[in-house]
């Protein structure tokens, strides 16, 4: 029996990358996983299939988090499949690598809509569904604590806001024994970092050199930390910012 048997988890942005890794890990450990996706239905189905192939249970739900009312849409989809939630992982996010001189208001607003507004209102409308003793994990970024990539400023700002959300929410939900934490990855090998890691001959080497461990992380490394925080073992950790950058900030 897995540590999450009998529990339901929702992972936003779970059709690929870090989100898929988290969904697969929670599913493998017994959770029934709601695999949220924004547009790529085929990729979401692949995540569901991967969870099921490992002996878990999952279902896909769609909601475009860029627009107003997205959180309500997400929960309407969720309610068709489940009647309560134990673990919420706010993972969905979009980035921007344009320097401040080039980023438009539209792009800025889109990044904040998905990365900040969506998690806030997903939680707001999901509080009555989240069972006592539950877990909330918000996927932040090491860039919230370093100016190593200033062209990612708008993205980093959203993660700073998400960290404040985690901190303050832990006080609000603590009375119900619900923990809330931020998990901050560094450079992880996903399709989002493909250009950075594989776009030049030395991309991977330069990225690995940033880590004290001399490597580039995989989604599984982030998923393992999320699984700990979501488990009974993580019951006394809340309001925290967990560095999963492989020592890139040291």
Regions found by a protein language model. Give the residues of each.
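Conserved glycine-rich cofactor-binding loop
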Residues: 8, 15-16
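Short C-terminal tail/terminal secondary-structure segment
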Residues: 227, 238-250
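Alpha-helical segment proximal to the catalytic Tyr-Lys
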Residues: 128, 171-172
């Amino acid at each position: 029996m897995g540590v999450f048997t009998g529990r339901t988890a929702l992972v936003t942005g779970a059709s690929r990358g870090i989100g898929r890794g988290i969904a697969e890990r929670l599913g493998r450990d017994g959770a029934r996983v709601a695999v949220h996706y924004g547009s790529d239905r085929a990729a979401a189905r692949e995540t569901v299939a991967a969870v099921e192939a490992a002996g878990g249970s999952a279902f896909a739900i769609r909601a475009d988090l860029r627009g107003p009312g997205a959180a309500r849409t997400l929960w309407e989809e969720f309610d068709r499949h489940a009647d309560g939630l134990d673990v919420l992982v706010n993972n969905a996010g979009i980035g921007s690598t344009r320097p401040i001189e080039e980023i438009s208001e539209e792009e800025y607003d889109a990044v904040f809509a998905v990365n900040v507004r969506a998690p806030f209102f997903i939680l707001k409308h999901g509080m009555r569904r989240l069972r006592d003793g539950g877990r909330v994990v918000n996927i932040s970024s090491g860039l919230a604590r370093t100016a190593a990539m200033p062209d990612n400023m708008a993205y980093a700002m959203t993660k700073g806001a998400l960290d404040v959300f985690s901190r303050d929410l832990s006080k609000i939900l603590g009375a119900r024994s619900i923990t809330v934490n931020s998990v901050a990855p560094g450079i992880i090998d996903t399709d989002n970092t493909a250009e950075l890691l594989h776009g030049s001959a030395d991309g991977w080497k330069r990225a690995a050199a940033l880590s004290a461990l001399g490597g580039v992380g995989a989604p599984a490394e982030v998923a393992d930390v999320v699984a700990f925080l979501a488990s009974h073992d993580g019951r006394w950790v809340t309001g925290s910012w967990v560095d999963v950058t492989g020592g890139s900030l040291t």
